[in-house]
């Protein structure tokens, strides 16, 4: 949660989602994750997750690890296929003093919040390519978050035509990006310039945005004490 701002005469804030509410949160997100994992296990399929290397990937890993620890979802192989995300995660590990209180407690009591026996960080291009030859169930988290470059595009190329696979969208997708076309439900999408049929299911998680929604923005402003006149 953000630290309440100090008293001020003028407050300028961002308002990316100032006109809407995030529809999903807490239990709704957990239930959707449970459904995806159950589907992947039942169909021995892959969950391909385009994710930003900074922040979003680490958040996803921590969320998944927490759900497994709580017995809310069954563990399955998770591959973090982004060299940049791996380097950023190392920075996160080295600076637990920057965490909020809850995350810091997890780090000190349970060890590395970004590691588990079922989590593997992929480094080499050769290992990344082998993921496309593997059978599921598994989760592949790779950048770029909007599917415009990076290793995730290769995973989409190899997995998008399998109707048992799932593409989980966990972040904002700008117009004219491959990610936005997936969200919009295009049946044929361009991958490396080649029109490619989409048979995989696309599931959108709306509650994971790093941007505050209307209620959160209002709560932030109302927390100013004393309130500006």
Model-predicted segments: where are they?
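Short helix/loop capping segments that flank catalytic or ligand/cofactor-binding pockets
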Residues: 1, 20-23, 58-59, 88-90, ...
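His/Asp/Glu-rich metal-coordinating catalytic cores
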Residues: 1-59, 65-72, 77
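Fold-independent oxyanion-binding glycine-rich loops
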Residues: 13-16, 51-52, 81-83, 143-144, ...
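Short secondary-structure boundary/capping segments
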Residues: 27-29, 63-67, 93-99, 182-186
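Short, conserved secondary-structure transition motifs
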Residues: 55-56, 77-94
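C-terminal regulatory/interaction regions
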Residues: 65-69, 108-229
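Acidic, His- and aromatic-enriched active-site or binding-groove loops in soluble protein domains
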Residues: 70-83, 101-108
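A polyampholytic, Gly/Pro-enriched intrinsically disordered region
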Residues: 95-110, 225
């Amino acid at each position: 949660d953000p630290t309440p701002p100090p008293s001020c005469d003028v407050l300028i804030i961002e308002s990316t989602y100032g006109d809407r509410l995030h529809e999903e949160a807490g239990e709704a997100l957990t239930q959707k994750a449970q459904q995806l994992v159950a589907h992947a296990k039942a169909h021995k399929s892959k969950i391909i997750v385009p994710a930003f290397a900074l922040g979003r990937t680490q958040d996803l890993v921590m969320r998944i690890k927490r759900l497994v620890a709580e017995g809310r979802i069954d563990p399955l192989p998770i591959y973090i296929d982004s060299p940049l995300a791996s380097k950023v995660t190392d920075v996160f590990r080295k600076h637990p003093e920057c965490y909020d209180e809850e995350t810091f407690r997890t780090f000190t009591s349970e060890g590395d919040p970004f590691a588990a026996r079922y989590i593997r960080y992929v480094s080499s291009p050769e290992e990344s390519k082998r993921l496309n030859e593997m059978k599921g169930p598994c989760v592949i988290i790779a950048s770029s978050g909007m599917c415009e470059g990076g290793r995730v595009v290769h995973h989409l190329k190899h997995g998008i035509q399998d109707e048992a696979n799932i593409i989980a969208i966990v972040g904002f997708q700008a117009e004219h990006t491959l990610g936005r076309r997936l969200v919009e439900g295009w049946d044929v999408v361009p991958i490396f310039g080649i029109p490619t049929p989409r048979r995989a299911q696309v599931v959108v998680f709306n509650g994971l945005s790093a941007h505050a929604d209307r209620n959160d923005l209002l709560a932030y402003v109302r927390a100013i004490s004393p309130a500006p006149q």
